Amino acid sequence: MGKNVVVLGTQWGDEGKGKIVDLLTEQAAAVVRYQGGHNAGHTLVIDGEKTVLHLIPSGILREGVQCLIGNGVVLAPDALLREITKLEEKGVPVRERLRISPSCPLILSYHVALDQAREKARGEAKIGTTGRGIGPAYEDKVARRGLRVGDLFHRERFAAKLGELLDYHNFVLQHYYKEPAIDFQKTLDEAMEYAELLKPMMADVAATLHDLRKHGKDIMFEGAQGSLLDIDHGTYPYVTSSNTTAGGTATGSGFGPLYLDYVLGITKAYTTRVGSGPFPTELFDDVGAYLAKRGHEFGATTGRARRCGWFDAVILRRAIEINSISGLCLTKLDVLDGLDVVRLCVGYKNADGDVLEAPTDADSYIGLQPVYEEMPGWSESTVGAKTLEELPANARAYIKRVEELVGAPIDIISTGPDRNETIILRHPFA
């Protein structure tokens, strides 16, 4: 029997999922994206060469691994085709191994225009979206008016739906946001060009997955963003527009939850966040700058500097509960090298002095202060360590304390960006 493993982020994204998915796909027959869009940025470093993927599953760099984009992903055809071209220039036969669900909602030019117009109108109160049309595309899906990938192959039907959509969205763009209208004919012509290129890659992803399952193949489900950005469970409204938690695996792929064997939660040894929203352990001092510099904390999708702070056990405990995490992968441990003291947030204190767990909305974070434990740091390098015994004693103590605070085992430790710089204590596919 094969094993089916979910890999997802437990913080606010950027936890290092891409590297771990790439590492574990050595055993997988297929890798599946099940939510999000090209707002994700998964960075892989193989033999020193960096590749950033936004839509295509990270298993694409492993020869023979099938890559699937499930119905829960909002798909921007132009972004996907650019990504395919870049990989093909490196000799990766993407079109042979990539299959896309015809049920994926499309992201088209009017979604991008709406996304950017809204952020501009919000001014200082902006959410911090990537401006790539993700939210508006999910809105159209939920409103049951959205165009899907499968619609591309029926020109008349597509044109009729597009006309109705542009009547609606152009009214909002022109009369509410005072922005230019999107041209119908240009949008239609571009979409029909995409159709010819995408058609050979269409497949019933759910049926493909169940066929693999029946043949005893190992399957990996690759999450995007992080659990605290989940539309339902995140720091609302500073969240993304999809379910980034483990429940999204089933709805975004057609693969029922009882078939999932292991959920791997990826967490940094510290905490980062891109864009607006609450961040109790955020640092504005030299330590924050140190983490940002050593961790190269700039978004793979937007290039924006990430906010940095101490490890937060409170949000991780919440993520472990809502995802039924089987085990954790601790990434970027090496970024903490050289610090005299490391801190871990163990709770939040309100104005009355009460220690609380993680709130469920952004406003409830106002006025909360982190409660810290301090531990001695380490001066020795952890970069490239392959065994637990190679790590400094204080680094091992830090790892043990994280496990105690969050109530879940750390099964994998990442000690550098390359797939080889990893300590595997328990393999998810074992």
Curated annotation (Swiss-Prot):
It is found in: Cytoplasm. It catalyses: IMP + L-aspartate + GTP = N(6)-(1,2-dicarboxyethyl)-AMP + GDP + phosphate + 2 H(+). Disulfide bonds: none annotated. Mg(2+) binds at residues 14, 41. Its cofactor is Mg(2+). This is Adenylosuccinate synthetase. Pathway: Purine metabolism; AMP biosynthesis via de novo pathway; AMP from IMP: step 1/2. Substrate binds at residues 300-306. Binds 1 Mg(2+) ion per subunit. Belongs to the adenylosuccinate synthetase family. Its EC number is 6.3.4.4. It comes from Pseudomonas aeruginosa (strain ATCC 15692 / DSM 22644 / CIP 104116 / JCM 14847 / LMG 12228 / 1C / PRS 101 / PAO1). GO terms for biological process: 'de novo' AMP biosynthetic process; IMP metabolic process. GO terms for cellular component: cytoplasm. Keywords: Cytoplasm, GTP-binding, Ligase, Magnesium, Metal-binding, Nucleotide-binding, Purine biosynthesis.
